[in-house]
UniProtKB/Swiss-Prot annotation:
The modification Phosphoserine is found at S478, S603, S614, S630. InterPro entries: Aldolase-II_Adducin_sf, Aldolase_II/adducin_N, Aldolase_II/adducin_N_sf. It comes from Drosophila melanogaster. It is found in: Cytoplasm, Cytoskeleton; Cell membrane. Residues 1-36, 897-956 are annotated as: Disordered. This is Protein hu-li tai shao. 'Hu-li tai shao' means 'too little nursing' in Chinese. GO terms for biological process: actin filament bundle organization; adult somatic muscle development; axon guidance; centrosome cycle; cystoblast division; female germ-line cyst formation; female germline ring canal formation, actin assembly; fusome organization. One of its GO terms (cellular component) is female germline ring canal inner rim.
Length: 1156
């Protein structure tokens, strides 16, 4: 029997512990009826198919027009419905047209008795098996089967049909005398002479329900022997007791008695002399089991007869009994079940046993049938071959149905044709018909079949003078339908992993609340039943005295106690209605009254004290005006919701207190008083100055120079101090100090006030406390984590400016200082170009001895702090460059930039390239590459992109050239002509750029020109700043002279791009102090004025030779080195550059100081 499909229960079996009717076995006839119902549904679906009907009509019409008979039409139908003969032609010897065995379809099965259809199918299948095995001899053989034990009706094959033509509906039903009780679907009757043999056996042995006559050649040959069938093989032993009868063919009363005596009470196989054998059994399966084995045993014995009977070895009697009992025993897995059933039936009566054998007990395991497994396997073979046996399998081949695809939403065939199911037979087994279980799916099917299109209907109430509108939803009667949702799984929309017991628990709680009468009708309605709107408005405005004069009969009802179809009949009772005397009381008054009562309850002795009043009460009072609707005081009321964002400080703000001013003044005294640092170097006592603010280095894109203010800073001189102090005071007054007020003792006659650039310190949002925007330093783009390098750079700048102002430029030389201004100040160059001419910045090869000094030089402290970070930055550079050959990284450890005019063996390509690069101006050379800005070394082409493609000889020569020390030489000359480089006061800055590994070598070789431009831009910004400071001091001195000689007012120096100059005459304008630094490509010293006029104000001459001068020069060289190293370190960390060391030397500074 097939297993009944269990619906999914989401992982939990709700029927655990309950009796499951599906686990009990149904009777065979009921199970067969259920299967036939499913098959009838299939047949009805196919017969109702439009495609199948059209195909049948086409076949019939074509056959009728062609003149073919009914046999041709049936043949074509068999070809359509059946399967090709070639599928089973190799299995059996004969291959005929496959006529279906089970041809009882539709309502025809209802005309047969209970279980008769199954027996017909089995018997017809047995005829088909005998035909396929070739054990038939024309029309003479017969197979009979008893329908019931208590009835003498038998099924026999009609005389005139071959075995392969017999179907289930073609069998005739006859009685014990051979009279036809029920004719089959054919016109053939029965053969009474052949049926006599079967009738004698059935009459003598009621336990035999099937008899098969075997008249094939091997069986007839063995039945003709005197010895009969010998126990030579296992096939002969499983037959049990075999009897022999001298059959003559004529049956009279004496012959029947001898046949009964020959058969005996136990034997089920009898050999008919010279005619064959008659195999009997309690079931059709057992009779066919005996027929198969007797044919095999006879064939084996015939093959052994030529050796002689004396040479044959017979199986002993004990072994034969053991083999016979083993063949009747069920398999091991079913033997225990059968033993339990047998033990339970030991105390039952014989009649009850017979009844139990006839009708299987519900819930008991199926009885084992001898030969049932072999017969069922043969039925599967016939079904697979397309014979359609109709056999009911007791042990299905497949345990359960394969898994089906499940979707959340499916489209069921609500109104559709079933023509597409013609070839899809699996859909019939898995379709909606299998789900139509009436016992369990009654409510569900009714819900699924409920209408899904509704119409909104509004019904007026009855029984009230002011009826309300009741909304109802009724099913729409139109034939249009929407798309329904097919639900295969009852838990289809339930989330996975949930427990259905939780739902049942909540459901039980809801029921308990309902039983406890805890469910109310909800909020009370303020709409008065039976009162019109005019009357309601009058009642609302009526006074208490007038309320008694107006009585209204009201009707009220709860919808919860009215049936769904009678909700519009709202009137249940009527009662007089009077005006509520508290209707005139507002919500605010009620809330205030409730709060007063609550406060009085909280008082200790009953006296009212307003101690609980708070600011929140005022908020509540303000909220009641905005929201007049009252709510219960026990619930929280939301007055107002505002969304704000807490302010997040941009940076930590540190405000300097007055107590720290003196400490900071001492710590940073060298920044605001350069003379103090000079006296420290010259072993003089330092001067104390008062500091007001701390300067902040702003990271801006370019320099801007604010206008000069008047009268904001004054320097007072005292009588104490003379001589060299005069020079120092002038230096201090001309040095841009961050709002420092210096008091120096000078002669009284030199007491004067000098105009300076100053502004009142003011508070800013900066975390430095105060800010004074006097001037901005050059741009250094640096990561915020390296913010300390900015301060170090600013400190070194101040030191260098102070040293240059005090030592390298005396009072006379400073009067000669001025910046060459451009004749076209409105022109502006691109910021990406360099501001230093190539005539002043040259890349040269230094001698080997200089190389050793540069390599042995110590690295600055600022660079030592960032070497580890530099290695990590360089390792992160993903540069894929082709390499000509592997080279030792130690060769390029101190490798630096290759100058544009480096000395190499001149070949044609190198000579042309060097000559071209040297003759081109710098602006054109910079256009040959693209600067990457602040993102590091970009994807630009350098001066030597052919290093990877040159020959080995040239590569070796270039490597030898690169191993030498290379320096960037920056010259500050005192003459505007570039050729005058040997004049006094010349500063040379040598910058050594070295590499650390071979990978950096290739990077520099590729991006040499780009990196040079970046380096020039860095140096240019520093020189801009230094020259601006020096020019500013000179302008202060000129302003002082103009003030003493009553000259015209000085024009305000301004930055070109930010403050364009106003038109004025040449007499009222003076030279700008580098007001357009972007246009200045040379920084030189030009003579303005008479040198002799200032000789009397000169300071005492410094000694030409001596220890102080050497100390000053060495200190200045160190300070300039630190400045350049700090600047380079800052740019290296931001641009991922690889500058290693910067050094400065003063080639002709000593001669210039001595000559001055």
């Amino acid at each position: 029997m097939t297993e009944v499909e269990q619906p999914p229960q989401n992982g939990i079996d709700p029927t655990a512990g309950e009796d499951d009717d599906n686990s009990k076995a149904r009777p065979a006839d009921i199970e067969q009826d259920m299967r036939e119902m499913e098959r009838r549904k299939r047949v009805e679906a196919i017969m109702g198919s439009k495609l199948f009907r059209e195909e049948l009509e086409r076949i019939v019409d074509s056959a009728r027009d062609g003149g073919a008979g009914a046999s041709g039409i049936l043949q074509q139908l068999s070809d359509i419905v059946g399967v090709p003969v070639s599928r089973v032609g190799s299995v059996f010897k004969s291959s005929n047209c496959m006529v279906p065995i089970n041809d009882i379809r539709g309502v025809e099965s209802m005309g047969y008795a209970k279980g008769e259809k199954i027996l017909r199918c089995k018997l017809a299948a047995t005829f088909r098996l005998l035909d396929l095995y070739g054990w038939t001899q024309g029309l003479g053989a017969q197979i009979t089967a008893r329908l019931k034990v208590d009835q003498e009706y038998f099924l026999v094959n009609p005389y005139g049909l071959l075995y392969h033509e017999i179907t289930a509906s073609a069998l005739n039903k006859v009685d014990m005398q051979g009279q036809i009780v029920e004719q089959g679907t054919t016109n053939f009757g029965g053969n009474k002479s052949h049926f006599v043999l079967h009738s004698v056996v059935h009459a003598a042995r009621p336990d035999i329900r099937c008899a098969i006559y075997i008249g094939c050649s091997p069986v007839v040959a063995i039945s003709s022997l005197k010895t009969g069938l010998l126990p030579l093989t296992k096939d002969a032993c499983v037959l049990g007791e075999i009897t022999t009868h001298a059959y003559t063919g004529l049956f009279d009363e004496e012959e029947r008695n001898r046949l009964v005596r020959s058969l005996g009470p136990n034997s089920k196989v009898i050999l008919l002399t010279n005619h064959g054998a008659l195999c009997c059994g309690e079931t059709i399966e057992e009779a066919f089991f005996a027929a198969c084995h007797i044919v095999q045993a006879c064939e084996t014995q015939l093959k052994l007869l030529p050796v002689g009977l004396d040479n044959l070895v017979l199986i002993p009697e004990e072994s034969r009994k053991a083999i016979y009992e083993q063949s009747r025993r069920p398999p091991e897995d079913l033997e225990k079940k059968f033993a339990a059933v047998a033990a339970a039936e030991d105390g039952a009566a014989t009649a009850e046993k017979d009844a139990a054998e006839a009708v299987p007990k519900v819930g008991s395991p199926p009885k084992w049938r001898v030969g049932g497994a072999e017969f069922e396997a043969l039925m599967r073979m016939l079904d697979n071959a397309g014979y359609r046996t109709g056999y009911i399998y007791r042990h299905p081949l497949i345990k359960s149905d394969p898994p089906k695809p499940k979707n959340d939403v499916e489209l069921p065939p609500a109104v559709s044709s079933l023509g597409y199911l013609l070839e899809e037979e699996e859909l019939f087994r898995q379709g909606i018909w299998k789900k139509g279980d009436i016992r369990k799916g009654g409510d569900r099917s009714r819900w699924l079949n409920s209408p899904n299109v509704y119409q909104k209907v509004e019904v007026l109430e009855t029984g009230t003078p002011d009826p309300k509108k009741i909304t109802k939803w009724v099913a729409e009667g139109s034939p249009t339908h929407s798309t329904p949702v097919r639900i295969e799984d009852p838990l289809q929309f339930v989330p996975a992993g949930t427990n259905p017991r939780e739902f049942k628990r909540v459901q039980q709680l809801i029921k308990d609340n309902r039983r406890a009468d805890k469910i109310s009708a909800g909020p009370q309605s303020h709409i008065l039943e039976g009162v019109t709107w005019d009357e309601a408005s009058r009642l609302k405005d009526a006074t208490v005295s007038q309320a008694g004069d107006h009585v209204v009969m009201m009707g009220a009802a709860s919808k919860g106690i009215i049936q769904r179809g009678f909700q519009h009949n709202a009137t249940v009772y009527k009662a007089p209605y009077a005006k509520n005397p508290f209707d005139n009381v507002t919500d605010d008054e009620l809330n205030e009254y409730k709060r007063t009562v609550e406060r009085k309850k909280k008082s200790v002795h009953g006296e009212y004290t307003d101690t609980d009043f708070s600011e929140s009460e005022a908020v509540l009072q303000a909220g009641t005006k905005k929201y007049p609707q009252s709510e219960p005081e026990t619930e929280h009321q939301v007055i107002e919701i505002q969304t704000q964002q807490a302010p997040v400080p941009r940076q930590a703000e540190v405000v300097l207190s007055d107590a720290l001013v003196s400490q900071l003044a001492q710590k940073y005294a060298f920044l605001y008083s350069p003379g103090q640092y000079m006296y420290a170097c010259m072993k003089m006592a330092p001067l104390m100055h008062k500091v007001y603010v701390i300067h902040k280095v702003e990271p801006v894109s370019k320099h801007n120079y604010p206008p000069v203010n008047d009268g904001n800073m004054s320097i007072h001189h005292n009588e104490s101090g003379a001589g060299f102090m005069a020079q120092e005071s002038s230096v201090i007054s001309s040095t841009p100090v961050r709002n420092a007020l210096a008091s120096v003792s000078l002669p009284e006659e030199r007491n004067h006030s000098i105009l300076g650039l100053s502004s009142t310190p003011y508070r800013t949002i900066s975390h430095f406390g105060f800010n004074c925007p006097l001037i901005t330093s050059p741009t250094i783009l640096l990561h915020p984590e390296h913010r300390s390098i900015w301060q170090r750079v600013a400190e070194q700048r101040e030191k260098v400016v102070s040293f240059i102002d005090l030592t390298t430029l005396s009072l006379d030389n400073r009067k000669l200082l001025n910046v060459v201004t451009s004749t076209h100040p409105t022109q502006c160059q691109s910021q990406s170009q360099s501001f230093i001419s190539e005539k002043h910045i040259q890349l040269e090869v230094t001698p080997p001895k200089r190389k050793q000094r540069v390599y042995s030089a110590t690295i600055s402290s600022g660079l030592d702090d960032s070497l580890d970070e530099l290695d990590s930055l360089m390792s992160g550079l993903a540069i894929n460059m082709p390499r000509s050959r592997e080279q030792d990284s130690g060769l390029y450890r101190s490798y630096t930039f290759l100058p544009s005019n480096h000395a190499l063996p001149k070949d044609t390509d190198a000579n042309n390239r060097d000559q071209t690069d040297r003759e081109r101006p710098e602006a054109e050379q910079e256009e040959s590459f693209h600067c990457a800005g602040d993102s590091g070394i970009g994807d630009s082409t350098g001066r030597r992109p052919r290093l990877a493609t040159t020959s080995n000889d040239s590569s070796i020569q270039e490597a030898e050239a690169y191993t030498q020390g290379k320096h960037v030489k920056l010259t500050l000359s005192s003459s505007p002509t570039p050729t005058a480089t040997q004049s006094p006061a010349t500063i040379e800055i040598l910058i050594n750029v070295s590499l650390r590994n071979a990978e950096c070598v290739q990077t520099v070789q590729t991006h040499e020109q780009e990196f040079r431009a970046k380096l020039e831009r860095v140096i240019d910004e520093e020189i801009h700043y230094i020259s601006q400071q020096l020019a500013f001091k000179q302008r202060q001195a000129e302003l002082h002279e103009q003030q003493t000689t009553s000259r015209a007012p000085i024009a305000t120096p301004s930055f070109t791009t930010m403050h364009p100059p106003a038109p004025a005459s040449s007499s009222s304008m003076v030279h700008r102090s580098n007001s357009a630094p972007e246009l200045c490509h040379t920084y030189s010293y030009v003579a303005v004025g008479d040198l002799s006029t200032k000789q009397d104000q000169a300071s005492p001459q410094l000694p030409a030779e001596g220890e102080p001068l050497n100390d000053i020069l060495s200190s200045l060289e160190k300070e300039l080195e630190r400045l350049l190293n700090s600047v380079v370190t800052a740019h290296m960390l931001h641009n991922k550059a690889i500058i290693h060391e910067c050094r400065a030397r003063f080639s002709q500074l000593a001669d210039g100081i001595v000559s001055s």
